[in-house]
Each structure stands twice: as structure tokens, then as C-alpha cells.
A protein has these predicted regions:
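Conserved catalytic core of the tyrosine transesterase superfamily
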Residues: 1-295
Length: 295
């Protein structure tokens, strides 16, 4: 089996059987291609051994941090597990390879005052103003991922029931409650500025569009937020994900439990959600004083 066939079969497996998104599949393919180039096509996938893997990992350690290295190892391990599953090979060359220990970096979070300041920098006099306001309110009001936002459809909005439906990682769908402020801003955009756009048929059901009637991309959302952060003179690094972190942190600060936040964020494991516990020492201190018998 050559590399092209192996990678294509693996991509089909990830898409059809695992339900992975296009972006996830692309990341896997990119990492496998890097390894293929490293061994300079001298071996086919069935001939790779642990020494080849170790040499590759030593090479990428010069340019990638531990988190990125772990991602590459995970991707390669999955690829060779697939080859085992298909009975092309018997052993995984990454069987004894350990991922590097990663430090858990706490995400940047915006205070409510900072979010209000950012929103105040949106120019509502321009045609994109209502759209940009709806985007910020949705990112913060529902804590959705930027990929979920750009894929959001009008048919996913259940405003009478106060819910929206989003499609997350692995094409998993979940319902998220939506508050009145967020709902009102989306409605204003849909009824006013979006109505003035000549929408291309393919994108008629997409909520957020550019001036040419096509759906917004993740890169466009990043650009919108970066420009607003610059206007607000923020020193911290701001991205669409910052609003997701802020959403979760503010819920925790105001008494929401981790299981609820986990469901709202669409985390498979509560371990992923637990990082927000480290962001609010005041909350932890108050919890101990309130609930511990010796406090």
C-alpha cells in the first residue's frame, strides 16, 4: 500500500465512520504528510518502524511546542491504529512512544466591563454593524465555538423555545439556551441589514453573511474581533475563543456547576471543563468557606 491510498482510506474512515469535521481531517492529513516527507518517501506506510517515528519526533521538537507535538503523536497513532484495524500491519510503531508532558495554560478571559467596552466599539452606522454586534453577543451569550458560529443556519434558530441548535466537533449536535439580549441582536440583524444582502442560493440558510452574500469564514470572524480589540486598546490576546472562555468563567463565578457548563460547551469530558475552576480563586475560596465544616 502506498501513502496516497493509505491517507485517502484513513480520511474516508475519519469522515464516514468517526464523523470528524473537515478541519479535523485536514489536521490529521497535514501531520501524516509531514512524516511522509520526513522519511523522504523511502518507505511505504507498512514498513515504518519506531526508529522512524523517534527520528521524526526529534526533528519536530525543534519547532513545535509540547502541545503541538502531542497532537502530531495522537494523529500518527490513530493512523497506524487504522492500518492495524484494516489488517495491513500487526503492530503500531507508536506503541511505546509517550507524548511529551504539556503545561496547562490558563485561557485569557474578559471581564463583563471589557466585553461591554468591546461592544461599544462596534460601529452601528455601517452595514456590517448589526451583524458584528450579533456575532459578539452570540459568542459570549451562548459560548459557542467559532466553527459552530460560521456554520449556524437560520433553520437552527428556535427563538420561540429560546434555544439554538449547533453542530460541534465530530458533527455532534446540541441545543443551547439563548438569552433575550442575544436573541434580540440576532433578530435585528436578520430583519434589517441581512435582508438587504443579495444572498447566493447556496448560503440562503446561513445566518452570518459577508457583503457578497456568502457565509463568513473563521478567518473573517478573527479579523472582526482583532479590529475591535485594537479599538478598545486591549493588551491581552483576544480571539473568538476568548468569549467562550469568558462565558464559562462568568457562569462559574455566578454559581453554575461544572456539569451544566460542560453540557453547554459541548465538552465530552468534564476534565476539559475543569480548567475554568483554576480561573476563579475567589469562587473556590467562597465555596470552601460556605460548605466545609472546618472553614
Amino acid at each position: 500500500m502506498n501513502w496516497t491510498n493509505a491517507i485517502n482510506d484513513f480520511n474516508d474512515y475519519l469522515k464516514i465512520e468517526r464523523g470528524f469535521s473537515v478541519n479535523s481531517i485536514s489536521s490529521y492529513k497535514e501531520d501524516i504528510t509531514k512524516f511522509k516527507k520526513f522519511i523522504n518517501y523511502t518507505k511505504n506506510p507498512l514498513e515504518v518502524n519506531s526508529d522512524d517515528i523517534k527520528g521524526f519526533l526529534h526533528d519536530i521538537s525543534k519547532e513545535l511546542n509540547s502541545t503541538s507535538q502531542s497532537r502530531v503523536i495522537s494523529g500518527l497513532r490513530s493512523f497506524f491504529e487504522f492500518l492495524i484495524f484494516e489488517k495491513y500491519i500487526k503492530d503500531n510503531p507508536l506503541k511505546l512512544i509517550e507524548s511529551p508532558k504539556t503545561s496547562r495554560k490558563l485561557p485569557d478571559v474578559l471581564s463583563l466591563e471589557e466585553i461591554d467596552l468591546l461592544i461599544s466599539k462596534i460601529d452601528l452606522s455601517i452595514e456590517q454593524g448589526e451583524r458584528n454586534l450579533a456575532i459578539i453577543e452570540l459568542l459570549y451569550g451562548c459560548g459557542i465555538r467559532v466553527s459552530e458560529l460560521v456554520d449556524l443556519k437560520i433553520s437552527d434558530l428556535f427563538f420561540e423555545e429560546n434555544f439554538i441548535k449547533v453542530t460541534g466537533k465530530g458533527n455532534k449536535q446540541r441545543l443551547i439556551p439563548i438569552g433575550n439580549i442575544t436573541k434580540q441582536n440576532i433578530n435585528n440583524y436578520l430583519l434589517n441589514s441581512r435582508n438587504k444582502i443579495k444572498v447566493i442560493n447556496t448560503f440562503k440558510d446561513h445566518v452570518f453573511l459577508n457583503r457578497r452574500g456568502k457565509n463568513l469564514t473563521r478567518a473573517m470572524i478573527f479579523t472582526i474581533i482583532k479590529k475591535l480589540a485594537k479599538k478598545a486598546n486591549f493588551n491581552k490576546s483576544i480571539s473568538p475563543h476568548t468569549f467562550r472562555h469568558s462565558f464559562a468563567t462568568h457562569l462559574l463565578e455566578n454559581g453554575a456547576d461544572l456539569r451544566t457548563i460542560q453540557q453547554l460547551l459541548g465538552h465530552e469530558s468534564i476534565t476539559t471543563t475543569e480548567i475554568y475552576m483554576h480561573l476563579d480563586n475567589k469562587y473556590l475560596s467562597e465555596a470552601l468557606n460556605k460548605f466545609h465544616p472546618r472553614a
